[in-house]
Amino acid sequence: MKKPLPLILDTDIGSDIDDSWALAMILKSPELDLRLVTTTAYNIPYQTKVAAKLLEAAGRTDVKLAPGRGGEPALDSVAEWVGDYDLTSYPNLLDNAADAIIDTVMNSDEKITILCIGCFKNLADAYEKCPEISKNSRLAVIGGNIYNGACNGWHPALSGEWNIRCDLDAWRRGIEKTDWEVELLPLDVSGGVLLDTPYFEKVRKAGENDPLIRELVASNDVWFRTENWNYYGPTSPLFDTVGVYACITHENLNFQMLPIYANDESVSLIDPERGKMMNVALTWDDKERFYKFLTARLCGEI
């Protein structure tokens, strides 16, 4: 078996529920060596509690956790599930995300992958403080919308994808204008990804004997109620799980090196003059195969 991939997760967990699914997927994946989780984007104390509670449920309080830079809106969608969780009880809580990213990368004997599934404030702050981190790390990024291939019905044609649109300046400072090697997972492959009812029910069943999955499902149901989600059996879109999958394997995904540039409307374009070269996932061979993998992984079958 290959040595596990050293990983940092930078996440806006606690807003959309797919970040929680992504964290659970990481924690269930022996191919990944999660060393640090950093929170970004909105109500940082609340978001950091969401991450801490899931890490604790998985028995992984050895993973370092660092709050990042916040902003608006609050988007406290699973606050009911978080309850009165005491963040000070988390044993590996660090002071701030940018310094934690720098320290983790610079003190690693191996190149680290930073999986970015939220806005890019923490990356921008870390890179501007210590550009040398790009030499010992690479980025896997959920962001962008290249050909709108999987997004019909979800987004207007050529719209700006949320992780870029929520802070375009952070995208430019943390991604486009850096020396980082970037692997991009746009909406072309992450859009419209969800588990149909039989798969979701299987995950629910697994939660009866797995504390992490039990808490994931409980928080998901709170999210449904808070967001007035018209629940009819399947999950909501699980965009960020595609980023985790790409950190585990490239099988089933088709990549192409492309120069990517986000314009002032946050629309991601293929632009040979202004774009940064990125390895971009554009299509699936078989999306159903991914659904089977995700379900089996969360259920502890593989």
How should each PLM-predicted stretch be described?
Residues 1-302:
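N-terminal acidic, glycine/proline-rich low-complexity segments
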